[in-house]
């Protein structure tokens, strides 16, 4: 347990930051889930729109230090590829 005033303050700050980061991660996961659901339905236009709204949220997660930049780059790339495949006509 924190004993000095400084360590008590640091513990309070860490707790507050953890709560903010948890909310940010939850928000990002919600946007990702919307993209996944749109892809699952097979509607390319809805999936593209969902991806377009999710990309800035993912980028913001990197800026705020919630997610690693390579993790976000990988997620964006994979989702964009899946949306692209969905929007292409089926090869006969």
Curated annotation (Swiss-Prot):
GO molecular function: small ribosomal subunit rRNA binding; structural constituent of ribosome
Keywords: Ribonucleoprotein, Ribosomal protein, RNA-binding, rRNA-binding
GO terms (BP aspect): translation
GO cellular component: small ribosomal subunit
One Pfam assignment: Ribosomal_S20p
Family per similarity comment: Belongs to the bacterial ribosomal protein bS20 family.
NCBIfam families assigned: S20
Role noted for this protein: Binds directly to 16S ribosomal RNA.
Protein name per Swiss-Prot or TrEMBL: Small ribosomal subunit protein bS20
Organism name: Cereibacter sphaeroides (strain ATCC 17023 / DSM 158 / JCM 6121 / CCUG 31486 / LMG 2827 / NBRC 12203 / NCIMB 8253 / ATH 2.4.1.) (Rhodobacter sphaeroides)
Gene field: rpsT
């Amino acid at each position: 347990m924190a004993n000095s005033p400084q360590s008590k303050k640091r513990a309070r700050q860490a707790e507050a930051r953890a709560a903010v980061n948890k909310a940010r991660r939850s928000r990002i996961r919600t946007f990702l889930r919307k993209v996944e659901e749109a892809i699952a339905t097979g509607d390319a236009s809805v999936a593209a729109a969902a991806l377009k709204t999710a990309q800035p949220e993912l980028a913001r997660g990197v800026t705020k230090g919630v997610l690693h930049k390579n993790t976000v780059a990988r997620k964006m790339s994979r989702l964009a590829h899946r949306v692209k495949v969905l929007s292409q006509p089926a090869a006969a």
